[in-house]
């Protein structure tokens, strides 16, 4: 050990010498004040050591660039003089490594940072100064320049100071070396200390002197040999031999034999408490249940071998006291183990000694556990209820007292309370029976008291007390039962409950509910007697006092009887309180009464309740209670009236209180009063129910008194009495005389009225029933279905009707008597007025009207009559009384109309719910008929009018169903945008009972209902008639009954003639002077304002809507649509005239061509247009058109004529195809842009194009249902981006290129379709497909090559090729091409002066022009919009066009639901709102609200319109 340590100590002087040497070097370096050596520049430039706190270095620079090394190395040679050239001395300080010095940054990098910062500030300042131009900005600019100059100067001054500091910075290098040297020495000391600690704890721990082996040394010295080796060596390297399992089994078996033998010899001395002895594996386990368990064994075979105690287990447990741990600590158990082992070693009977020792310990432990449990209960849950009277661990006695009574005595000190336990329990160990364990003794003794189970191990004082409490409670209850039965022999006392016993007492003889039973129980914790009656409050004074009396030791029979009488009265009072809760009374306290009212209560018994009537607050019901031997509790009721400062009792009649004979009142819920001579059955009704009946009777009597007074004030005679025995309801207020309130003679009505009374029903709600009984009713139900209304066996022609009860309930809560009287009078007036008109009608009904109508119901306040051919129309008549005075002008009849199922379908098993919808057209004039009935009171005339006019009105009423007509195209043509471009197609309204007006645009038809089943129709359009051929329309239907009346009725003038609308168009407005002869006027299309007389059948046929080729229409509808279409077509053609088209200087070259209007009449329009034959704008050949109203079919047709020799393809078949296409597609479509596209198509004549167009139209019209390819011409284009409509077929201004759009699909109803778009070169006769699809281009090339070779026109060839490939699957609907029209909306025109465009305000005459791109310009035909079904309005229509937005009549309701004249939808919804030149034309609601645009010539320099002068449009 010394040899290893000495070298370490030997090196210490050298380290001390080195340390002293370094200290001298430090002192020499610090004393050296010579300047540093000159700085040698580094390759990367000058470097400077910067401190982080200098404020010049930037942290961002450190994070982005690596730190550089020192500018120059520390010169190790000291220079004594700058001019000396001698060899310098060596520096004693060590060199600082590169990474151990402070961080540095190159000076050039620092300068670059400063320059970049200044440049950035200058740039930002220059940008900000440009925005400051005012005077304030000039001042801010100057201040910004000053701040910038000051900041820049300060920054560069810091750099100058830094550069100057570099000259002397070399002196700081010495400090860096000193710092590094000190850190190095400190690390040496730390390493030395760590090494010494490691050696001390590791290597030197076993460096001690060994023990000297004397015996081997003697052997070696004496014998010269080494004979003995230490046993530690053997134990360390040679393990002991293990015993085998067989040997283990033999050993344990032998031990078991030895233990059995020894125990058998000791068996006579083994205590009997040891219940179990188990011998196994050489061990004997002895168990004393509930106390302990020990394990013993023998460690030898000799008789002298002592028993060895291996383990002791204490079985006494209490988890609450031990908090989950054993009660005996392991250290205590080890001590017990040692003491018991020593006692067993010296004992003659070790087994008995072990039992005696451990048994004594366990008994003491059990008693201590019980004491701890009792202490917890006394301090916790059973505080003040149990007490520990004695506890002696030596004597092993524990005495616990329970049911403690606390009392004060004069002998005690003030504040002290004496606690006396009524019962005690003693837990002890019997000295004479040491083996018996703990025993229990109760004071006083009783059977079946609680015991301790010592064998359980877990003793519980709580269980012992609980078992004891149950027995003690039963004892006390049995004693109380004997006391109660002795005090009240008739009182029935029952013992109930098993785990919680109690006594049940029936205080009243009729008590059957458990809530009214008194329950007497004993509190098991404190032993107090508890009394409870559920129906009474838990804090009831008498109940608590009775319980205290039973608990006290001084409880006499008289005291018990007194409390029982009080409780019976309290129970009856509570019964009464509960019985009147649902009645209109409330209980009041005596303190709430006035002083003079309290004086009246002086003689009344103290047990009483006071009930105040809610509806009659001046009346109080006083109910007093007093004990009685016979009735148990006697009640007395008095009525107290408090009026002003006076209070008095009112004597109640006997029939109100005791004379009510109740029978089956409870079971049936109604009161049936038996005759007065029969005996009363009050025993069937309990006492509180009789009180409720009495309160209700008194309340009824008071209410009737008030009502009778109010009725007598009105002059109505009344009588309050009961009805006969067979009439339920009790008291009733009978009305005997109403002559003073009836404004007319009503003797017949009162002869039919048997009884009129008012009853009060307060069972569930406080309601009044106005009851009237009639006989000889004028009208009864006589419909052919339903229940019969005459008795069997009576003749059908019997004049007297059955007696009928009519009872109507008025659910009026808290109503005042004045309101009830008013309602009674109103009800009588309603019956009287209804009876007046019904009685008069009943006389005519039996003679005449029963063949034309049926009575559905007559209930004296309402009459329901069904009429019509099918009896499916209902007339509902009622009378409403609104005024206070009977017979006032404010009263009126309610006349409503409805519908029902036809009578023939009531008994039918099959009902067609999909028939044409029915609505009652008389609802249009219900107000007019109501006013007439109010003036005349003549129901006979009203029913005559309804029966006579129902057939024609049902037909005419078809026009009142809501059907919208699109005005989007027309509004775009006129100019101003309309947000809701729809209008009602028709508007039907009634002027009076016999006059109707039907409006459709500018056309107004007046329909007169005449007698003799005749109808008169005339044209009453404003200013002049406009219906050409109106007589011819009805004459075509029935020429025999149709005639023109000679008397011409003047047309009413407009309310505002200046702005009401145009008169009628003249040829000068829309056409130039032409050298053409006008056609002769057809006399059948004459215009007249004379009424046209016809029969009902004629007007029904004219208005009968039917499904014709997919369109639901009728002759009159088709005629009016034609008249309206002619007016709209004239506007469309005027927009196609040269005057309304942009001039040639405009950049737009998409149009529908020019047309010239030749002649315009109400029944036709003639115009012409140049042919598109390849000559362009220089073409001289014309196409002549005539759109006219056919006098035979009374629908629109068109005639097309080409000049002779100009179109070889204009054959009769092709012309018929063109005209048929107009009739089936263009006209039903109703779209103005479709007409423009149609005209553009029919003008194309180059290279027999007419034949191709006719083929296309034929394919569309004659599409077979089985075909898999459906081809349709698209006439209208819907731009989804601009939401505008436009013609789908357009031509450029030079008339050289025309656009075609053809829709190809599998069927007309197919959801997927494709659009074939191509441009036809009119002059070159070839087609171009501007598409990115190579297949389409290839098809166009093939068609052009074929056309060039064989001649003909490529339009039909291309379409036919597409159809063939579509059928073969090469061209399918999924391959949708891109749209080729980017903007096809027409140019917008000037907004009218009074209507501004949406979201803009433009001056009158201003023009907003939209310039669509050229056809050949890139992007002008290819738009980004995707093609969908909304872009092509012609798709999936029966013949390619929509049905004018018309709806199925089955989907609409009654007229007027959208808005008639006067509604707020002026130019959107009102009929006639779209007229020439204005969205709100003639027929709109406010004619002066919408003006018309002024078409004035443009000023110089403007080129928006044609230079021709236009007159004001339209003319006023």
Swiss-Prot record:
GO terms for biological process: regulation of transcription by RNA polymerase II. Component of the Mediator complex, a coactivator involved in the regulated transcription of nearly all RNA polymerase II-dependent genes. Mediator functions as a bridge to convey information from gene-specific regulatory proteins to the basal RNA polymerase II transcription machinery. Mediator is recruited to promoters by direct interactions with regulatory proteins and serves as a scaffold for the assembly of a functional preinitiation complex with RNA polymerase II and the general transcription factors. One of its GO terms (cellular component) is mediator complex. This is Mediator of RNA polymerase II transcription subunit 14. Residues 1474-1483 have a biased composition (Gly residues). It is found in: Nucleus. Residues 72-83 have a biased composition (Basic and acidic residues). InterPro entries: Med14_N, Med14_RM2, Mediator_Med14, RM3_Med14. The keyword Transcription regulation applies. It comes from Caenorhabditis elegans. The keyword Phosphoprotein does not apply. Residues 22-98, 1434-1516 are annotated as: Disordered. Keywords: Activator, Nucleus, Transcription, Transcription regulation.
């Amino acid at each position: 050990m010394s040899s290893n340590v000495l070298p370490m100590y030997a090196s210490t002087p050298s380290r001390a010498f080195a340390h002293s040497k370094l200290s001298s070097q430090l002192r020499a370096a610090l004393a050296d004040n010579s300047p540093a050596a000159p700085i040698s520049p580094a390759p990367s430039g000058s470097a400077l050591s910067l401190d982080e706190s200098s404020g010049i270095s930037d942290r961002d620079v450190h994070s982005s660039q690596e730190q550089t090394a020192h500018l120059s190395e520390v010169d190790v040679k000291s220079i004594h003089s700058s001019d000396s050239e001698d060899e310098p001395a060596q520096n004693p300080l060590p060199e600082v490594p590169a990474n151990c010095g402070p961080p540095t940054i190159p000076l050039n990098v620092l300068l670059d940072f400063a320059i970049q910062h200044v440049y950035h500030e200058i740039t930002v300042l220059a940008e900000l100064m440009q925005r400051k131009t005012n005077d304030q900005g000039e001042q801010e600019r100057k201040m910004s320049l000053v701040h910038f100059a000051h900041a820049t100067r300060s920054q560069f001054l810091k750099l100058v100071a830094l550069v100057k500091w570099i000259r002397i910075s070399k002196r700081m290098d010495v400090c860096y070396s000193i710092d590094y040297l000190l850190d190095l020495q400190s690390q040496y000391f730390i390493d030395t200390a760590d090494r010494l600690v490691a050696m001390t704890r590791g290597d030197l721990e076993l460096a001690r002197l060994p023990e000297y082996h004397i015996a081997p040394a003697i052997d070696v010295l004496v014998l010269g040999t080494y004979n003995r080796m230490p046993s530690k060596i053997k134990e360390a390297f040679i393990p002991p031999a293990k015993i085998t399992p067989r040997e283990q089994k033999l050993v344990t078996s032998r031990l078991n034999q030895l233990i059995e033998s020894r125990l058998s010899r000791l068996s006579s001395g083994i205590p009997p408490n040891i219940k179990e002895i188990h011998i196994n594996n050489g061990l004997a386990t002895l168990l004393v249940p509930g106390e302990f368990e020990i394990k013993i064994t023998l460690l030898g075979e000799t008789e002298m071998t002592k028993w060895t105690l291996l383990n002791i287990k204490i079985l006494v447990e209490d988890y609450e006291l031990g908090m989950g741990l054993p009660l005996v600590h392991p250290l205590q158990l080890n001590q017990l183990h040692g003491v018991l082992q020593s006692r067993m070693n010296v004992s003659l009977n070790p087994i008995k000694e072990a039992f005696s020792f451990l048994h004594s310990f366990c008994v003491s432990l059990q008693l201590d556990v019980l004491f701890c449990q009792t202490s917890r209960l006394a301090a916790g849950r059973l505080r003040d209820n149990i007490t520990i009277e004695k506890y002696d661990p030596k004597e092993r006695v524990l005495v616990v007292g329970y049911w403690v009574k606390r009392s004060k005595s004069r002998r005690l000190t003030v504040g002290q309370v004496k606690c006396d336990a009524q019962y005690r329990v003693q837990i002890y160990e019997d000295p004479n029976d040491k083996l018996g364990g703990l025993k229990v003794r109760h004071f006083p003794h009783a059977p079946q008291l609680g015991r301790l189970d010592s064998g359980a191990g877990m003793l519980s004082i709580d269980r012992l007390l609980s078992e004891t409490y149950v027995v003690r409670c039963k004892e006390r209850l049995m004693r109380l039962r004997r006391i109660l039965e002795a005090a009240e022999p008739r009182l029935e006392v029952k013992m109930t409950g098993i785990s919680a016993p109690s006594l049940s007492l029936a205080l009243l003889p009729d008590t059957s509910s458990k809530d009214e039973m008194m329950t007497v129980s004993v509190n098991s914790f404190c032993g107090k007697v508890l009394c409870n009656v559920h129906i009474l409050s838990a804090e009831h004074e008498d109940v608590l006092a009775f319980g205290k009396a039973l608990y006290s030791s001084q409880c006499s029979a008289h005291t018990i009887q007194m409390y029982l009488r009080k409780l019976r009265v309290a129970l009856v009072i509570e019964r009464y309180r509960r019985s009147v809760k649902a009645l209109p009374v409330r209980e009041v306290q005596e303190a709430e009464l006035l002083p003079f009212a309290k004086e009246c209560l002086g003689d009344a018994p103290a047990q009483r309740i006071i009930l105040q009537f809610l509806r009659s607050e001046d009346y109080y019901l006083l109910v007093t209670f007093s004990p009685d031997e016979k009735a148990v509790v006697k009640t007395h009721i008095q009525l107290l009236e408090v009026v002003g400062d006076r209070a008095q009792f009112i004597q109640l009649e006997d029939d109100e209180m005791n004379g009510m004979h109740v029978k089956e009142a409870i079971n049936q819920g109604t009161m049936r009063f038996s005759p007065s001579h029969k005996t009363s059955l009050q025993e069937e009704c309990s006492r509180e129910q009789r009180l409720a009946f009495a309160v209700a009777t008194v309340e009824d009597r008071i209410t009737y008194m008030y009502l009778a007074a109010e009725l007598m004030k009105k002059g109505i005679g009344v009588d309050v009495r009961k009805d006969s025995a067979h009439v339920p309801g009790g008291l009733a207020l009978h009305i005997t005389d109403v002559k003073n309130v009836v404004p007319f003679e009503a003797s017949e009505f009162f002869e039919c009225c048997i009884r009129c009374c008012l009853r009060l029903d307060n069972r569930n709600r406080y309601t009044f029933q106005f009851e009237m009984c009639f006989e000889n009713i004028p009208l009864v139900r006589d419909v052919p279905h339903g229940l019969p209304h005459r008795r069997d066996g009576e003749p059908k022609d019997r004049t007297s009707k059955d007696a009928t009860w009519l009872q109507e309930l008025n659910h009026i809560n808290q109503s005042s008597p004045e309101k009830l009287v008013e309602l009674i009078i109103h009800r009588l007036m309603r019956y009287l007025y209804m009876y007046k008109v019904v009685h008069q009608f009943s006389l005519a009904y039996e003679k005449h009207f029963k063949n034309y109508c049926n009575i559905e119901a007559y209930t004296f306040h309402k009459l329901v009559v069904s009429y019509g051919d099918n009896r499916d129309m209902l007339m509902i008549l009622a009378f409403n009384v609104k005024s206070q005075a009977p017979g006032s002008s404010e009263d009126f009849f309610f006349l409503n109309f409805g519908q029902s199922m036809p009578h023939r379908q009531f008994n039918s098993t099959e009902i067609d719910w999909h028939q044409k919808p029915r609505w009652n057209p008389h609802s249009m004039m219900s107000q007019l008929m109501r006013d007439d009935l109010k003036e005349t009171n003549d129901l006979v005339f009203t029913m005559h009018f309804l029966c006579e006019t129902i057939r024609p009105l049902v037909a005419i009423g078809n026009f009142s169903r809501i059907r919208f007509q699109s005005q989007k195209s027309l509004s775009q043509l006129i100019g101003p945008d309309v947000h809701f471009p729809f209008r009602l197609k028709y508007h039907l309204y009634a002027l009076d009972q016999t006059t109707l007006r039907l409006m459709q645009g500018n056309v107004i038809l007046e329909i007169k209902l005449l007698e003799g089943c005749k109808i008169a129709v005339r044209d009453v359009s404003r200013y002049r008639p406009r219906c050409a051929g109106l007589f011819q329309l009805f004459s075509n239907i029935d020429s025999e009954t149709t005639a023109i009346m000679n008397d011409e009725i003047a047309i009413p003038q407009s309310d505002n003639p200046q702005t009401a609308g145009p008169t009628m168009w003249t040829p000068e407005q829309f056409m130039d002077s032409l050298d053409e002869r006008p056609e002769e006027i057809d006399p059948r299309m004459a215009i007249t304002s004379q009424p046209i007389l016809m029969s009902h059948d004629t007007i029904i046929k004219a208005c009968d809507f039917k499904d014709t080729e997919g369109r639901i229409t009728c002759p009159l509808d088709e005629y009016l649509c034609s008249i309206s279409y002619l007016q709209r077509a004239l506007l469309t053609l005027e927009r196609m005239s040269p005057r309304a088209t942009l001039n040639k200087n405009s950049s737009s070259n998409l149009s529908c061509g020019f047309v010239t209007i030749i002649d315009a009449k109400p029944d036709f329009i003639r115009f012409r247009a140049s042919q598109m034959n390849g000559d362009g704008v220089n073409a001289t050949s014309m196409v002549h058109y005539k759109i006219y109203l056919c006098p035979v079919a009374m629908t629109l047709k068109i005639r097309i004529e080409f000049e002779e020799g100009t179109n070889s393809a204009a054959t009769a078949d092709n012309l018929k195809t063109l005209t048929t296409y107009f009739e089936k597609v263009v006209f039903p479509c109703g779209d103005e842009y479709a007409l423009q596209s149609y005209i553009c198509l029919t003008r194309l004549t180059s290279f027999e194009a007419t034949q191709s167009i006719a083929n296309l139209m034929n394919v569309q019209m004659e599409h077979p249902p089985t075909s898999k390819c459906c081809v349709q011409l698209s006439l209208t284009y819907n731009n989804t981006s601009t939401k505008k409509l436009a013609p789908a077929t357009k031509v450029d201004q030079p008339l050289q290129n025309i656009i075609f759009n053809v829709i190809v699909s599998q069927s007309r109803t197919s959801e997927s379709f494709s659009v074939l778009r191509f441009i036809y070169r009119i002059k070159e006769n070839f087609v171009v497909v501007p598409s990115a699809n190579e297949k389409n281009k290839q098809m166009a090339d093939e068609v052009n090559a074929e056309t060039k070779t064989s001649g003909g026109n490529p339009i039909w060839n291309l379409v036919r090729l597409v159809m063939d490939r579509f059928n073969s699957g090469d061209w399918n609907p999924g391959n949708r091409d891109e749209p080729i029209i980017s903007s096809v909306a027409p140019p917008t025109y000037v907004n009218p002066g009074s209507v501004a465009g949406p979201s803009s305000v433009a001056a009158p005459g201003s023009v907003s022009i939209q310039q669509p791109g050229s056809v050949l310009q890139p992007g002008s035909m290819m738009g980004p919009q995707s093609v969908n079904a909304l872009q092509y309005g012609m798709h999936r229509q029966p013949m390619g066009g929509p049905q004018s937005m018309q709806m199925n009549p089955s989907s609409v309701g009654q007229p007027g639901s959208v808005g008639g004249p006067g509604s707020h939808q002026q130019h959107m919804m009102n009929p006639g709102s779209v007229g020439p030149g204005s969205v709100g034309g003639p027929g709109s609601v406010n004619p002066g609200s919408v003006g018309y645009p002024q078409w004035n010539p443009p000023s110089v320099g403007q080129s928006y319109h044609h230079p021709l002068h236009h007159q004001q449009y339209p003319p006023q």
